[in-house]
């Protein structure tokens, strides 16, 4: 699963992740940033 085109987040089913470039990365739920 890649990044969703309309925002910076990944598919919700993949858990707390966000986009970094074209890849999904883990999202730090404490500071809401990509790790």
Swiss-Prot record:
Q: What else is known?
A: The primary structure of the mature peptide is identical to that of U2-agatoxin-Ao1a (Agelenin) from Agelena orientalis (AC Q5Y4Y5). Negative results: does not inhibit mammalian Cav2.1/CACNA1A, Cav2.2/CACNA1B and Cav2.3/CACNA1E calcium channels.
Disulfide pairs here are 3-19, 10-24, 18-34
What residues bear Leucine amide in this entry? 35
MF terms (GO), sorted A to Z = calcium channel regulator activity; toxin activity
Protein's UniProt name: U2-agatoxin-Aop1a
Gene Ontology cellular component? Answer: extracellular region; host cell presynaptic membrane
Arranged from A to Z, the UniProt key words for this protein are: Amidation, Calcium channel impairing toxin, Disulfide bond, Ion channel impairing toxin, Knottin, Neurotoxin, Presynaptic neurotoxin, Secreted, Toxin, Voltage-gated calcium channel impairing toxin
**Site entry (Critical for insecticidal activity), positions:** 9, 28, 33
Q: Where in the cell is it found?
A: Secreted
What are the TM regions of this chain, as residue ranges?
A: none
What is known about the tissue distribution of this protein? Expressed by the venom gland.
């Amino acid at each position: 699963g890649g990044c969703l085109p309309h925002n910076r987040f990944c598919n919700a089913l993949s858990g707390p992740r966000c986009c970094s470039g074209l890849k999904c990365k883990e999202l730090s739920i404490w500071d809401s940033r990509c790790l």
